[in-house]
């Protein structure tokens, strides 16, 4: 790569709810894409991710955007509705902007804030972060070859 070329940048959004788990996705993401190429953005919860993802994708600064959240059944509302709205919104953001928007927004069948579940989901989010980074690299490479 010559000096005229710059390395692609990636945006990573993470929800603050269950931050100790969602932050692990960023850890996995930066195992595949150097942290120096990743701008990190925090949002209150999963529901706020699609709007920011769309804005970041539309900015023209990023090759791809990834968004991480853990949507769980808190017993108050139907978490499936939130999860569906988030995934639909993230997909729409990518389709509207033409920039890949990748979801690491997971909705487990069961989640309890026990040491056992925290450990399982923490490790799972590292893997899902890696997978999101690999998808970002693959899809941007494929799309670049189509444009050539």
Show which residues each predicted segment covers.
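Glycine-rich phosphate/diphosphate-binding loop of Rossmann-like nucleotide-binding domains
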Residues: 2-42
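Short, acidic/small-residue loops that bind anionic groups at enzyme active sites
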Residues: 82-108, 127
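Alpha-helical scaffold segments in soluble metabolic enzymes
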Residues: 24, 28, 89-92, 131, ...
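Active-site rim loops that border cofactor/substrate pockets in soluble metabolic enzymes
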Residues: 32-59
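Phosphate-binding/catalytic loops
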Residues: 109-127
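Glycine-rich phosphate-binding loop
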Residues: 52-90, 94
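Short, ordered loop/turn segments at secondary-structure junctions
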Residues: 16-17, 43, 69-71, 106-111
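A charged, well-structured terminal subsegment
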Residues: 123-148
